[in-house]
């Protein structure tokens, strides 16, 4: 399943904070089957957007809960356009 995470940072983002968060995410990827397709810092209502795959909603939720100390994350389920188009048939 694909997910989009809309992130607001709670802490000042330093190189050390970012490096530690990336280390944790990579460990989760290996352990829980999460695959991060991209992390982008953004301007506007959210500080960052993450696009990732997880085996199911529960694993995606666990990832968001683990990050709760450092960031607020709204997680959206994303359906690839090709799959959504099939629903129109």
Question: Which residue stretches match the model-derived regions?
Answer:
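An amphipathic, aromatic/His-enriched active-site/gating alpha helix that lines ligand/cofactor pockets
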Residues: 53-83
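Generic structural signal for residues in well-ordered beta-strands
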Residues: 36-39, 73-75
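Short S/T/G/P-rich N-terminal loop/turn motif that feeds into the first structured element of a domain
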Residues: 1-30, 35, 42-46, 79-89
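Short, well-ordered beta-strand segments in beta-rich or mixed alpha/beta enzyme
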Residues: 4-7, 40-64
